[in-house]
Amino acid sequence: MSIHISDEEAEGRNFDQKNKISSHEKNQIINNFIINYNMKKENDINQINEINEINGTNQSVNRKKNMDTVYKNIINMSNNMTQMYNSMNNMSHNIINASHDMMDASGNINSHINDTNNQTNYMMSSHINNIENETNNMMTSQINILNQNPYIRTRHINTDDMNQLDNISSQTSPNINNNCTTKYNDINNSYVNVLYFRKLKLNKKLFEKLKNKNIVIYLKYKDSTCTSEKIEITDPEINNLYLCFLVTEPFLENEKKIVKIYIKCFKDGKYKILSFGFVELNFVDFSEKFYRKKSYMLCYDKKNNKYIFGYFILILANQIKWKVCDNKVFYEYIKKSYFVSNRKNYDQQIFYICKKIQKKLLQSYYTNTTNPYRNLHNQALLKHFSVTHSCPGTFSLNTTKNKNSYDHYKNENDIETKNQNYLYDIKKSKSLIPLNLMKNDILYPQLSHDNYKIKSMIHNSYNIANYTTYKEKWGHENLYEMKKNNSIQEKNDMSMNFKGIEKGTANFLLNHEKNEQIKEYKDKYQKNNTYQSEQNCDIKQYYEKNEQINEYKDKYQKNNTYQREQNCDIKQYYEKNEQINEYKNKYQKNNTYQSEQNCDIKQYYEKNEQINEYKDKYQKNNTYQSEQNCDINTLDIKQVTNQIEDIKSEQNNVYSNITENPFFNTDEYEINHSFNNIHEYNDTDKNEYIKNNVDNEEEESIEKNIFDNIICEKLQNILNNGIESFIQEIQFILEHLKKKIIKKNDYFLNQLKNDHIYEYNPEMNSQNINEHNEEYTLEDYIIKSKYNNNVKNDIMSILQNCLNTTLLYIKCILKDTNINKQEKNIFAAYENIVKNIKQAVSHYVIENETFNHDILNTDILTQNKNISLHTSLSKSRNSITNKNCKLTKIEIQENEMESDKEKYLGHYNKTSNVLKEKNNMNSYINSDETLSSSSLSTCSNESHKKIKLMSRQIEHFKMNSYINENISSAFKYYEHKWKNKLAKIGAYI
């Protein structure tokens, strides 16, 4: 009987034989391993015995016992492993035998055998690796124990054993992934780049007590902080400083809990920030008050043995970026930061960085209107990154070298303004207006009503177009060297774009209907009247002007039909305003209203008067005309005159708003003309609206805007008196003064609310109207006048403090030895100018106090307890409110007011001489000895309206005379001497 053996069975037998050979080899390896360990044990025991024989101490006995127990454990573990290996080998044989039994049932059993064999090999290899690792650890521990014994010598250890130990310890162990270490590799070392450090000298005694104490730096920097340990200060400007800490203006009780930096100096000259901590704040305090603070650093120069005082800005790289939202602190790891590498264009690069950050903040502020917390946070950041606002004089761009810098900035802002609405909610965030745009005479409106929020989107495109035409006209010239008349005209036009939009849209709809009625009246007049006269010629000239406006409107409606609802009415309204401005400017320059070229406003009114005279003749001669046509004629003439009067009243309001804006560089004559010569200006205009509101608007503007009238207007006009680019270089002084006063916002915020309180709250408006009908007592008037005087004194005291700090600042610069003589000479010129300003302000304060005190004394002597201020105003107002009054009445009233003005000025010259003589003041005017108390009492017999008018006019007169006398002479002296040197001041500032 033959037995057939298949190929599969043969392969199974061959596999069994191979398996037996491999298992045998593995048994030999294990046996050799056990033998080696036994030999090692015997050698170690012999060594220990030799040590015990040499030393004869009990320590060796204990070590021997410990070694015996250790090796017993090793032997037991090895025996257990051999048993486990034998059991695994038996399992493999059993699996092979079972596979032979299953080969008849399945032909794919070989793959199953291979899988099981691989599993067994993997398990065995893993166990062997574990055994080797454990033995290595145990052997290293034993070696350490032996090394700790001072009696063991290297000669007692066999070299073969040492090599064997090295071979065992050199085996690689599995890699361990330490997630905690790799996670923070990116932020291991963070570097601080000092963007700006300004050196100023201070008194050493001021901070001498803090020299040996723990130094804490309070960092002002906005939302980037770092918690890593070893932060290096790499800026070369502070390499010689070993003591650095920050002095800030306190605003919280626990200010030391905000941001802390601990710095330590090492022997190698480097400075390490040991710790950098951040403490959570209240969101309101963190966003508003914290960023308003100016940060200063006080350092000690060990070479020159001086304390150095300055302020700095830090930007951190490779740091943790912190975010504060909903009173919680969040952070993220960032790798990129703004660095400045080129030291040549240092200021320009920093300026570019800050303006980029400012631009992003502006975009997020105006686009994200749903999250008020985010907007508040962006508002706080914007206060820091508006470079000229946060630290004046820090960054200076040379306009002579970079002529296209403003054009580049304008193009970027034009792109932004097309996608955004910069007029949105300006009154809630007044500090968000970019200061660079304001310096370059880009006008922003003083919004005072909520309707502008809706209409600003409609008129924004027109405002941008008007701005681009303004820049195309003046882009090639220096913005600070414009011609006076042209700059005033352009500012008037641009301000009318904002201030006259709301009235313009409503008025022009009426004007269109009025012009159509005038055209109908003209056609009827030409048909019915055949004779010609000079009056007729005047009327035709008048109608030709209106016809040109109507033709322009028709052409504009045909060409721009798709913009008819939004822009047509507004642009035609501005065309009318431009024509009236041309008439007014030509009249002010030439004063030749009789010529045909100068079609001024006075000639325009004479034509209207001729029209009225002709209307009377026409109604008498042409009785056959219908009553309806007569009504149309009278209505047309009245509407046209009222229309022109309203437009001129708005123009006069623009003049007052221009003088209130501190960033306008208007002519000194125009500002004096608008404030001091208001009645003479009204002689040319014949404007009833201004006559009715002179007593109210001008009194309030003087009391509320006295700081702007004294400093921002008058000082800028004097600074712009023929000196090229001087206003740009002295801008840091004005910004410093302005910021110091803004910080005293307890009074100024209330004044800002009072400016618009009657527009927002109708109840307060009704109460104010009811109060006009009541009579004020003398006690109420004295209390009110004392309050106004206290307010003025507070403002003037703030101004004097600002001037004192500026003088101290300049003195510190003049005493600094690190500044060259050329720069000191420039600051010496500044010092003389500021001293003259201080002298002018002090004289003004003394004159104002003595004059107000004398007026109050004269009021008390007369004992007039029932003086009605508002009744006198209402009487004068009712006498002029009649719109149909003739021109002769207006002229009579104006002549009376001019005569009163001359009396007041003459009377004040006498009273001021007496006051100056009493106070022993230096004056060039001789005092009148015949003046007695009776002459002083004559002033009390006048009404309070006249007293206020006199005080207002004299107040401006004295203010202008003192400032012009003391400051303009200083500028004329230094104009020729320092004209070339003033351009170099930006390098230091």
Curated annotation (Swiss-Prot):
Reported uses of this protein in biotechnology and industry: Possible candidate for an effective malaria vaccine as determined by epitope response in sera.
Organism from which the protein derives: Plasmodium falciparum (isolate 3D7)
Listed name of the protein: Uncharacterized protein PF07_0021
Coiled-coil ranges per UniProt: 538-654
Region (Disordered): 1-20
Swiss-Prot/TrEMBL keywords: Coiled coil, Merozoite
Taxonomy, superkingdom: Eukaryota
